[in-house]
Amino acid sequence: MKVENQIENYIVKLTKTLKDLNVKDIEQCSSVLLDAYENKKNIFICGNGGSASTASHFACDINKGVSYGLDKRFKIIPLTDNLATISAYSNDVNYDFIFLEQIKNFYNPGDVLIGISGSGNSMNVLKAIEFVNENEGVTIGWTGFKGGKLKEVSQFSINANIDDMQISEDIHMTLVHLMMKVLRKKLTGSEDYI
């Protein structure tokens, strides 16, 4: 296959996956985030690898891109950014517990957890989701492929239904920017930010 054809095929698959997203699912997730904002709840977010980068990016864009200039602020806490804590739990306990044990330090009933997993089967994400489900919280899963277990156990989910990890991750990054614009518009009347 020529490189040009490979590029065209990627763009076609990405565009189709975007068009196939369930808008109602996205709207529900943005409503959950607005409710958390209105009720001053924490919003935790986690993922591994590329999904960890997406989690950090989401926290930045909402904490700064949406909250800037508002009297009341979003409380987005990425569970992916404290390398010392992550490595301590990985080394001393088990990698499966890196998000669960962090969330226990800050969690209050009614808080929200967004778990991102391309496969939908990342055990450390699932353990944190299960904890929040069992403790009167709200869970959102962002998945790829068929959604895996994360799609099943999350109260709300957005699934990039494609058997391609990179396109799944592209969709999740698009969700970050889409959510930022939706939330910013809802709270300020404008999508613009500094």
Outline where the language-model segments fall:
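Generic N-terminal amphipathic, Lys/Arg-enriched alpha-helix
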Residues: 1-21
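Hydrophobic packing residues in well-ordered alpha-helices of helical domains and bundles
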Residues: 7, 26-29, 55
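Structured helix-beta-strand junction loops
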Residues: 17, 39-40, 153
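A short, well-structured juxtamembrane/interface segment
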Residues: 21-39
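Glycine-rich phosphate/diphosphate-binding loops and the adjacent beta-loop-alpha structural elements
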Residues: 41-42, 51
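Hydrophobic beta-strand scaffold residues
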Residues: 43-44, 139
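Glycine-rich phosphate-binding loops that contact phosphosugars or nucleotide phosphates
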Residues: 51-193
